[in-house]
Amino acid sequence: MEQLQFLRLDRARFDALCGLHRAYKEAIGEDAPTQADLDRLLGAMEREKILFYGCVDEGGQLVGCCSVSPTFSTYTYATAGVFEDFYILPAFRHRGIARRLVSFAVEDSGVSSLTVGCADCDVEMYKALGFTVPLGNLLAFEL
């Protein structure tokens, strides 16, 4: 059985995270982040505005990631989180990594609730990962 490590990502693994993040953006048809985007991301990570989590295989390769952005919520009157940036390399899918990564992120971040907004095609996947409480519609304000 392969040995996997689940951890909070920091500056030491930022380059690996950037590579995985580029693959994620390409997979969903979005533009790759610019260097300025990545600089802002690193700053946000260092200030813990966003927490990135990863799964590393026994060879040290980052094979999956997700993020939790903590915020205060009156839904629970405690710290809640917004779940994003979820990506597992295709060769590592269907091995239970996704479930374990989500569980690790929830436990380590200490959030009292975790929400996710997703495309219609991803709803069943997120339900299978434990996102089962419907909260109505999620809309973004156009700026």
Per-segment meaning from a language model:
Residues 99, 114-116, 120-141:
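Conserved active-site alpha-helix within GNAT-family acetyltransferase domains
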Residues 19-32, 74:
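Helix-loop element at the rim of GNAT/NAT acetyltransferase active sites that forms part
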Residues 43-54, 82:
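A short helix-loop-beta-strand connector motif used in the catalytic cores of GNAT acetyltransferases and
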Residues 3-19:
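A short beta-loop-alpha structural element at the N-terminal edge
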Residues 17-25, 37-42:
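Hydrophobic alpha-helical core bundles mediating ligand binding, dimerization, or RNAP-core interactions
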Residues 54, 61-70, 87:
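Conserved beta-strand in the GNAT
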Residues 88, 94-107:
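Conserved acetyl-CoA-binding loop-helix of GNAT-fold acetyltransferases
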Residues 78-90:
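Conserved acetyl-CoA binding element of GNAT-fold acetyltransferases
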